[in-house]
Amino acid sequence: MEIKYTGMELKLHRHGIRTALASVFGAMLIATPLVGDSALANGIVTGKVFWFHLSMALMAIGTVVTAWLGGRKSIPFALPDGLLLLFAGITLATYDRQLDPEPEKLLFGGQLVVLWFLLRYFLTEAPCLKFFFLFVLMLTGLVEAVWGMQQLHGYAYSNHSLFRLTGSFFNPGPYCGYLAVVLPVCLWTALRFQKGMHYFGWVCAGAILIVPP
């Protein structure tokens, strides 16, 4: 049986596919801190690095598919875009290519520049994804907070022999740094929105505040 779509139905169908792709790949990227791979050497760190590379590749493919399905072919150029490109250009111009001290970080920085424009594209295509990405980011903070509390009370193993509190990271430094980044987002969401997001923001903020002391 052949299924035929009207013009409006086809447009909605393609829009749903674009939104689904952006949601899945964006959630994968935001969940990077939770990833680890014990099969790799130093899997806590390298697992996150490889996952980030995979998520970036999938987001790039998703952008191509989104454009092919009829998405906008361009995004408005803004001042932050120019400042970011200027900073990237200065970094490349001043990088010592003969010594080449940090090739991995240079690649990572280039991926962050690409990520900026990929997010700009997806959020222009589907502005509703802002709320979804906020929810996923706060959810990762909540998971990290619960993970840390389990480690403090002996219900989960720490990833470092000298520290009891590491979350999904190797030591408490990046763990607390990540919670410090997510906490203001949770507080802003709790104060800015109402109903579901309001209460979820307070739950995440409360859980994060309990852990570091």
Where are these regions (language model features)?
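Membrane-interface interhelical loops and short amphipathic "cap" helices
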Residues: 38-44, 95-100, 150-168
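Positions in alpha-helical segments
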Residues: 117, 163, 207-209
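Hydrophobic alpha-helical transmembrane segments
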Residues: 88-95, 129-158, 174, 209-213
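Generic hydrophobic alpha-helical membrane-span motif
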Residues: 100, 108, 150, 177-179
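Membrane-interface segments at transmembrane-helix junctions in multi-pass inner-membrane proteins
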Residues: 156-189
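Transmembrane signal-anchor hairpin modules in multi-pass inner-membrane enzymes, especially those
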Residues: 1-93, 99-107, 111-139, 188-204
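Transmembrane helix irregularities
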Residues: 34-35, 169, 210-213
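Hydrophobic faces of alpha-helical transmembrane segments in multi-pass integral membrane proteins
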Residues: 111, 139-142, 179, 183
